[in-house]
Amino acid sequence: LRWSTRREILQPMSVETTTFRNRVDQEAAPVRSWSAFQYGWNVGGAGAHWAGMSWRFSPWDFQVATQTRERYGAAKMKGLQLQDWGVTYDEMAPFYDRFERIAGTSGIAGNINGEIKPGGNPFEGARSREYPTPPLKDTHWMRTFREASDRSGYHPFTIPAGNISQAFVNPLGVTMGPCTYCGFCDFHGCGNFSKSSPQAC
């Protein structure tokens, strides 16, 4: 209860005020619930209690203004505050790859050097090689969903995870243990060193 229900691993809202507004003409009000913004209150911060989903931003994400303008025309951008990052996916790809090697990210690549691979995310940017560890095991309901999605013509794939599917020694020489599927990833540290957290990798 201490971690999963009372959220003692998260920063108390009384420590630092965060405000939010939806539009410029609104008065900013204090946030009363962290919701998706879960600040860690422990050694390792949010890196210790994250669930482990390990996505790369897509090429579109890095150049959202340019991509939107090219696809929909400049007129569609009126009133939008879109801006390119100033760095491209291709420039960031080697750093994503390095992180995935250090973290032991598990998954199936969907696009290796422009070649779409079955079982992976067909919409991801091109990567140079496979994930360092295989994807986590499917549960019964994941298999059921995958089969139904396949039959419907969709492209289901297992989310790349910072939860290690098999024993792994990363490039820094750190040994990480395989996930035991205990179910305590979110809002908990991993005592098995199976999650790509600061204390594990």
What role is predicted for each listed range?
Residues L1-A75, Q81-R98:
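N-terminal glycine-rich phosphate/pyrophosphate-binding loop and immediately adjacent elements
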Residues T5-E8, Y131-D138:
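Cofactor-pocket helix-loop regions in the catalytic cores of large enzyme subunits
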Residues A29-S35, G40, A109-N111, G153-N163:
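A short alpha-helix-loop-beta-strand transition element characteristic
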Residues F57, D61, Y96-G110, S149-P156:
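A generic secondary-structure signal for well-formed alpha-helical elements
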Residues Y72-T133:
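N-terminal leader/propeptide and maturation segments of large enzyme subunits in energy/redox metabolism
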Residues S106-K117, I159-I164, S194-P198:
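Short coil/turn segments at secondary-structure boundaries
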Residues L136-L172:
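Carboxylate/His-rich catalytic cores and anion/metal-binding grooves
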Residues H140-R151, G173-C201:
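Helical element adjacent to the flavin cofactor pocket in flavoenzyme catalytic cores
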